[in-house]
Amino acid sequence: MDDWSDYLVCLAVAEAGSLTAAANQLGVSQPTVTRRLQALEQRFGEPVFERDQGQSRLTPLGHKVIAHAKRMREEASAIERAVIAQDQSLSGLVVISASEGLGADWLPRALASFQRANPNIGIEIAIKNNTANLADREADIALRWNGPGTQQSLIGRRGATVGAGLYAAQSYIDERGAPQSVDDLADHACVGWSIGDFFGWPSSISGSAVVPRNISFKANSPASHLKGIEAGFGVGVTSHRLARASSGLVRLLPEFSTSLDLWVVAHETVRKSGRVRAAFDHIIAQMQADSAYFTRGEPSTL
């Protein structure tokens, strides 16, 4: 029988767009990926990819192969989910996906007591600022801002509401002054996101339109975004919990307040596992106990 994993290597190249990116994703060397693809193409008698300046594009045959390879991956993931679901023991590994802002700070502290109470359960935190694919077992549990979404196989519970407001460094205020109304923000430098508005941006006093922004600094991670505000690049919207933990930030225009709901999400089958269900419920309980921390930035209970 042909090696099924060759098809998954082919799928990784198609999704990553290059041999190098696929090798990094799979955790193997580029020559290994090349060798596996060559073996597959030799069996087929024609190429699966066209290679051009380091990029790999699917041939007509390649598109057909990838369609089947995706179904193979889905079925393999379904087998893994079924095996995990029937395991009710409180042992094994639980992989939790979270954004940088949560996974590097609050989540490890929240899980410490869980691991002490369940020493046979190992914890792995996967930092992802994009959405982990729970159906493909990229994680067992995910902390998400948008809930389970429209995928019916996912279940989620809202754990906390994360409040946010306008902040600037004292050094910026000393140099540029503080805005006296949301409309004044049009005359200030702003710290934004390169991945779209995370918490949103104030509308004008009339409410007819969003206040124009002069963005002086952009970032695609919460830590870098916060550092931009701290460094004095301008005014930015950040969560109260991050702002209160930072030195030298001043809240501006407290009448402007916004928030996002933070959800805990899992695949409905995987959540039946004893260890996953226990970790899921623990995270929810810790979020609820820390509601003032998330909503207003008050000291954490952890």
Predicted features and spans:
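A short LG(V/I)-centered, amphipathic sequence patch enriched
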Residues: 41-58
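C-terminal regulatory
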Residues: 134-136, 148-262, 289-302
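Short helix-boundary/capping micro-motifs
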Residues: 12-27
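Alpha-helical linker/hinge and terminal dimerization helices associated
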Residues: 7-8, 43-44, 65-87, 290
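Residues within the DNA-recognition helix of helix-turn-helix
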Residues: 29, 36-39, 110
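Central regulatory/effector-binding core of bacterial HTH transcription factors
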Residues: 91-151, 302
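Alpha-helical residues within the helix-turn-helix
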Residues: 24-25, 42, 63
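Conserved amphipathic alpha-helical core elements
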Residues: 40-41, 249
